[in-house]
Amino acid sequence: MIFRPTVSHAWRGIFILACLTIAPDARAGGFGIRAQSAEGFGAAIAGVAAGNALSFSYWNPAVLANVDRFQVEGVSNVIFPAISLDPAASNTVDIGKGALVPAMYMAMPLNSRMTLGMSITSPYGLATQAPTNWAGQIYGRKSEIFSINANPMLSYRVNDVLSVGVGLQVQYFKTKLTQAVDVVPFAPDAMLKADGVGVGFNLGMQLKPWAGGTIGLGYRSAISHDLDGHLTTPLGRASAAAGLTTPALVSLGVRQELNERYRVMGTVEWTNWSRLGTVPVYDGVSGGVLTTLPLRYRDGWLFSVGGEYDFSQKVTARAGVGYEIAPMNDVTRDVRLPEPNQVILSAGLSYRYSERTTLDLAITQSLGLGNGAVTIASGDPRYLGLPFSATSDLNVTIVSAGLKMKFDSLPFGIR
């Protein structure tokens, strides 16, 4: 006989499973978003920490030292996910939802050595939704994560070889997660909504130790969020609070000019997802610990290589390939977005309309490797009385466009 969770079980379940079990996002491992630069995405972000594009400052603020005049760059990414779950005893369901992810950058030199920059990005996000009456409804129906990160930065060119950069991150984080309170058809939802603001920093350096070669290293700090919100079930609405720390990220990039037309690039990226180990969840009124949440993530890695070729002074083509190690495995993979390891294939094009205006276009395909297993059984901290097992399939297409503009005069009359 299958045990059917009551509403009281759903209160515990929504906290244990949904409250900050923020599902993995196929775009960048865990619930991170890597789509921050159309030029970078055209080569699977190979070499971004060692590059020149303004949007590469997301990975390394020292990139700003390459800016020679006031610049702005806007990026738009459209995400088309094909993500399915095939439960052992039910029909296959599609849970992917498309999304639009924008980013904006600006920078202006203060003098021959210092450059001031600013970025508005969305480092974390998620949008998945399963059908109302699916086999795993008590473990997840709808998942939404939204973030905005404001990042003022300053770079300093020490000499012709070394540049450094530093920045301040102010980040808003919001989540909305739902799951059924019972296994019966049309069971009502339990819903968690919570948000918070956290502060962090970023650092970086670029070295140009030999002709045509650049090495870049960037660091984005972890950011602690005190999330406050409400848990709503058929029994009513209660205050809820929990702490979540988004992971630190380190990006190492290299670029080498082979001649006037050819360049090769590479990236190694590490994300400290393993710091999301056990998350205590609190009653928002009494402050007592309701439970602890073992996310059990491991650190994520990305390895990518790419190349660029200048067809002319106006047109540059690029391509790249990457391999990503996801932060979850067959034990910790979740129904909200079941992410396996992935191969990333990218291609892109830049068209310089004029000396001041450049258009970047890119397309990226993330291909999940194998059918990732999702298993929730007795003894699992997520278990709500109903054993669940499924295999998953993931295939995500991202189309990116970017517009770069340079200006001879600075805004506000600055000289």
Label each residue range with its predicted role.
Residues 27-44, 85-93, 98-415:
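Outer-membrane beta-barrel porins/channels
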Residues 8-11, 59, 259, 307:
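Residue-level micro-sites within transmembrane alpha helices that shape
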Residues 2-14:
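Bacterial N-terminal signal peptides that target proteins for export
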Residues 48-70, 106-113, 125:
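Outer-membrane beta-barrel pore proteins
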Residues 32-47, 65-82:
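Transmembrane beta-strand segments of Gram-negative outer membrane beta-barrel proteins
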